[in-house]
Amino acid sequence: MVNTTIKTTKSQEIFAAAQNLMPGGVSSPVRAFKSVGGQPIVFDHVKGAYIWDVDGNQYIDYVGTWGPAICGHAHPDVIGALHDALEKGTSFGAPSFLENVLAEMVIAAVPSIEMVRFVNSGTEACMAVLRLMRAFTNREKVIKFEGCYHGHADMFLVKAGSGVATLGLPDSPGVPKSATSSTLTAPYNDLEAVKALFEENRDQIAGVILEPVVGNAGFITPDAGFLEGLRELTHEHGALLVFDEVMTGFRIAYGGAQEKFGVTPDLTTLGKVIGGGLPVGAYGGRRDIMSMIAPAGPVYQAGTLSGNPLAMTAGIKTLELLQKPGAYEYLERITKKLADGLLQVALETGHAACGGHISAMFGLFFTSGPVHNYEDAKNSDTAKFGRFHRGMLERGVYLAPSQFEAGFTSLAHTDEDIDQTIAIAREVLSSI
C-alpha cells in the first residue's frame, strides 16, 4: 500500500509567509493550487524525473517546470556546461558566440525559421511577433483561438486559457478595450469560423496565431486538415500564419509541431525547451519578415538580458541531448504507455474520461469527450480533477495543478516510474 500521508508542515509555513510578501504567495497564478484545492508544495530540489519538497517528500514529476525539463531535471551535462559558463560571467549585454551556436541549431531544426531573435520569455516572443505581423502586412487585426495562451500581454488576454481559465476569469481587469479591439477570436478546430472572420474583415487581418497543439486549455490536438486549412486561408488572404511553439517546440518533435504535422507557418515563437530550464524565449521565421526587426529594419524590440549566455548554454546542451539517436522514440513510447494507462484506469474505475498524447506531451480530461476545443474542455469535471490531483500528490505523483494544463514526460522517466504512476492512479480513482 502506498503511503497516503505526507508531511507538509514546512511547505505550509513558507507559503503562509509568502502570501504576505507576494500576491497570492506565488510568482505565477497556477502555482497557488486555486483550481485543485489544498496547499501548494514548496520545492527544495529536483533531479531527473523527481522533485523533493522542503519537508523531504519525493514525487514523480509530470510538470517538468512547465515544459523545459525534457531531458530531466538538473541533467549532469547541462549542469556541467552551466558551471563552465558561470566562470565566464552571468550576463554580457553584448553579442556572444553562444547566440550564433543556438541560432544555427534552431534554424536547422525548425522548418519555418530562417532567422531568429532571442528574448527572455514566451510572452515577450509573442508580443514581438504580433508587432512584426502588423508591420509586415500593414494591417492591425489578428485572429487567435479560444483557449490558446500566448502570454499575459494585453492584446492576447481574450479567452486565453491557462491561468485565466484556472481562475475562472474571462479576461483580466486592467486591459483596455482598445488593446483587444483588434483581436478576433474563433473556436479552435473550427475552420468555418476562421473563414467567416476573414470574409467579415477583408484586407484587415494581419495574421493568425495559435498553439498548433493546445497545451494551455488542457491537451487538445488539431483535427485532420485544420492546420492545413489555416495555411491555405492565410495564403489566400495575404495574411501571416504564426505557430506559438513555446510549448510544442522541440517537445513533440525536434522540429516542433510544424515538423510533426508537415505544415510550415510564416513565423514561430519558441521558449521553454530552448533554454534548458533557464528564462528564454525566441521568435523567428522567413528572412524577409525577420529582416524588419531593428537594427536591420524599423520594427523595434530589445531586451537587457536577451541572449543571456547561461540560457544559451543550457539551450545548446539540451538540444544536443535531444539530437541523440532514439531520444524521441523513447519519449513517444513512455508517454504513450502513461497516457494509455491513465485513460484505461479511469475508464475501468467507472469515470467518464478522454485523453491522449503526442510524443512527450499528454493530457487527461474527466469527460466522455471528445475534446476538440476550449468549450469542450470547460465542460470537463474540474472538481473531480482536483480530487484526483490531491490523491496523486499525497501518494507521490506531481501533476499540473490545473485541468487546463498539459502534462509532460522526459528522457529521465523510466518504465518503473510509469508503472508506479498508473498503479497509484488506479488506487486514487477507485476511491473518488
Curated annotation (Swiss-Prot):
One of its GO terms (molecular function) is glutamate-1-semialdehyde 2,1-aminomutase activity. It is found in: Cytoplasm. It catalyses: (S)-4-amino-5-oxopentanoate = 5-aminolevulinate. Keywords: Chlorophyll biosynthesis, Cytoplasm, Isomerase, Porphyrin biosynthesis, Pyridoxal phosphate. InterPro entries: 4pyrrol_synth_GluAld_NH2Trfase, Aminotrans_3, Aminotrans_3_PPA_site, PyrdxlP-dep_Trfase, PyrdxlP-dep_Trfase_major, PyrdxlP-dep_Trfase_small. GO terms for biological process: chlorophyll biosynthetic process; protoporphyrinogen IX biosynthetic process. Its EC number is 5.4.3.8. Pathway: Porphyrin-containing compound metabolism; protoporphyrin-IX biosynthesis; 5-aminolevulinate from L-glutamyl-tRNA(Glu): step 2/2; Porphyrin-containing compound metabolism; chlorophyll biosynthesis. The modification N6-(pyridoxal phosphate)lysine is found at residue 272. One of its GO terms (cellular component) is cytoplasm. The keyword tRNA processing does not apply. Its cofactor is pyridoxal 5'-phosphate. The keyword Nucleus does not apply. It is an enzyme of class 5 (isomerase). SUPFAM superfamilies: PLP-dependent transferases (SSF53383). HAMAP family: HemL_aminotrans_3. Belongs to the class-III pyridoxal-phosphate-dependent aminotransferase family. HemL subfamily. PANTHER family: GLUTAMATE-1-SEMIALDEHYDE 2,1-AMINOMUTASE, GLUTAMATE-1-SEMIALDEHYDE 2,1-AMINOMUTASE 1, CHLOROPLASTIC-RELATED. This is Glutamate-1-semialdehyde 2,1-aminomutase. It comes from Nostoc sp. (strain PCC 7120 / SAG 25.82 / UTEX 2576).
